[in-house]
């Protein structure tokens, strides 16, 4: 009926698929098992749907189940599902779910697992993700670490979105980095997270920055975290 009334409208349908959560348990109550999703995908295409968006089912009050934090789901955990759906339909298929680097996104497209990459939390961390890739500056993309602290936790606490890796997020009107009135030589003592961020902002404002760090590695207390759980997670 939508196609009849608005023939030029592009209809994108989110295909909510449940994923395993231990033995005989699944994330995303109310979603579709993969076998049913495959049948439904073909029916949706036949009905005139233009694109399918493969994602974690999210009919639940626990957002941690459906927007998984670091270490709770592998990277690209929905890609195998989108690949299966793409094999069954001829319309474009998009996928989302812990695809956090340009390299990972490119691999999904290259191996035929999806036609489009959906970005959620990654755009809070770096709103210029796509622009940087288009300009050939993929190495400058700031990577979301999936901590869920500024985004998902804030949603559940009825607060506005923010990001622990992007201090401007949510404060774009008051925290814009603008050129300084006069250029100074600035020394930053300590190359921990705070020191590195201070150095980055100062440099963007046009100052000449020198960082002093007593150890052989930068990162500060982050280096301690790397020795604990989820050491394969991005930082």
Q: Which residues are covered by each model-predicted region?
A:
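Residue-level detector of conserved catalytic or cofactor/ligand-binding positions
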Residues: 229-235
